[in-house]
Amino acid sequence: MQNNLKIENNKPIQTNFLGHNAVYHGYAGVNDDAGRVFNREQCELEADRAKDLGLKIARTIYNFWGYDKAKQSWTWNTPDFNAFCAWVQRMKDRGIDIALNTGWLNIGEIMSCSWRAPFPGTVKGNWQQSLQNFTWFVSETVHQLIEVRGLTNVKYLVIMTEPNNIGNAYEVSGVKNEVHSMQDGWYQTAEAVHNRLVQDGRRSLVKLVGPNSTLTGCFPEFYDYIKERNPDWLDVYTNHTYLDFLWPEVKTPVNGTHVFSAIYPGVRLQQDVALKPNTEYEFSYYIKLNVENPNVLSGYVLHGAFKTLNKDGNGRVFHSGGDDTTRLGRYTTEMVEAARLPDDWQQLKCTFKTEEDVQDAVVGVFFDVKGSQKYSVYATGFSLKEKGSNTELLQNGNLNGFEHWFRCPYMLRQTEEQNAYDFWVHAVEKALKHIPQGKDFWFDEYNILSHGGNGNLARLEEPCHGTDLAVARVAFMNSGIQSSLLWTLFDQQWPNNHGYSDSKDDFGFKDGVHKFGVAACPMRKNWTYPAYKAVRLTDRVGGGVGTKVYKGVGENNVYCTMSQAPNGKLTVLVVNNNSTEQPISLTFENKVAATLNRYLYNPATATGEPGIPALEQPEKIAVNGSITDVLPAGAVVAYTNMD
């Protein structure tokens, strides 16, 4: 059956598309405690690959490299700072702009109470002085890179990373009397950076980007907090998430509810509540288990009323599992053993009575089911009422997104997102609802992660990972955002890092190499993965000032989009996210007549290669109002007359 696709090219949905970009840290050439340092050839190879992949903006981590520890002063002439500047110059030589992460960890960065290297300007217990010193550091960085060294491709400052997932840095910072929340700490920092750059006459040199938060934990509070104050000085709004699992269709037991799934132990779902002392309440929700053999499961689901502590590495959550359980009272929780969870939807109810202490109360569920088999515990329809009352005390109990629910980690997803394209579109929609009208938006991190090969997402080194990335990129373009940034472009050696991530995953740290990219770390192996070619092909949509994007309408898991450069040249991108070949007929609202080059990424024939893979010779096709084609399974195709 033919798939009828259409490009709606009457009106663009984005008029200043900056392209598909990536996180690519400026580590090449930086010192390492084990001597794992790139040589010149490796530095050039990695930079050449970045250009070959069509990268236009590289977002990089940035350390306090300008500080000379031996001299205890900011010399801006240390070996590591010079190595970083050399990396920025290599990017400039290849036409790649830099989005500099000026700071990584909210609050903890400034007060030197996080895993990052201590900030030389920290004044213990003095937030305002430490913040003033930090803003000097940021402004002086702009001066040293752009004004002194002429590295004018440094165009963006990203203010922190995941400021809503700061661990316990806020609790141990010693400045809680001056910083009232995670949002407040980020806002004070970002606004102070803006003001310092204005004061020093450097604000026009860079754009400020943030808050770079996740769609989990305190979302959308960060956006709303900014809007309530002054949203104008932030130039680009950002957010991100990752796709690591897709669920089959699960019908909800109650109309209007959305179903979430926990697939790992240790998942908490909670909501702050204002409870009265010495009062009886009823907490209820629906639950079901999906597993082949429940007999082998261990663990449990614990639900009810808890007290949150502010000392957890994951933020403000209640404790259970391997820690002491922080119940609100002795009899405020109930437990269901894993094997006894129902196969079909069943409403669980927990009646509890509060005692005198009801401060820091939350109601929630701790999913701690364990076993060698893959499983899902589904939950929905949450409710809390005072006994004998019909007044609902929970907000968003139907789980229409994460609003009002705190500490929903990545492994907790909406089951209505049954395909990857919808997942990415919904992720953008959630963020755009909360940013000021007319502001630019970047999806500042994303990737598709297969946990031990879960059966519906490809591993990073498998050819279909290229298809997965292409689906995300088409979804981002059709959502009208200004840019997307893949985490990460390459597998990279983090200096002085020797860590390992979970061995069952093909991503994460392997002896300090952060494995997330489309090419191996050159020090370990001169190799590009098959997905490298898919990323290069999708970057044929171009990007830059004045580049327009037109929305595509697909069907049956075949997706399309179109970009057009200021000179009128265009690229149509089509992805067949099916396991079988699919015939297509693509039409345009406004007739397109042109000779286009057809570039194909076929997972069935794509392989990894050393060096920089040669670009395949395209097939030329004449387009006169429509494109007719047959796409192989998992194929990514670009029809283009862009250079």
Predicted features and spans:
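Mature N-terminal, pre-catalytic/accessory segment of carbohydrate-active enzymes
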Residues: 1-45, 53, 271, 364, ...
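Alpha-helical scaffolding within the catalytic cores
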Residues: 3-9, 41-46, 79-86, 140, ...
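Substrate-binding cleft and catalytic face of glycoside hydrolase catalytic domains
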Residues: 50-249, 279, 289-298, 306-307, ...
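Glycoside hydrolase catalytic-domain groove-lining segments
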Residues: 245-251, 404-454
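Extracellular and organelle-lumenal recognition/adhesion modules and their flexible linkers in secreted
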Residues: 247-418, 422, 577, 612
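Aromatic/acidic polysaccharide-binding cleft in carbohydrate-active enzymes
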Residues: 447-559, 566
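Carbohydrate-binding surface patches
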Residues: 553-603, 634-638
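C-terminal beta-strand-rich structural cap/linker in extracellular carbohydrate-active enzymes
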Residues: 615-643
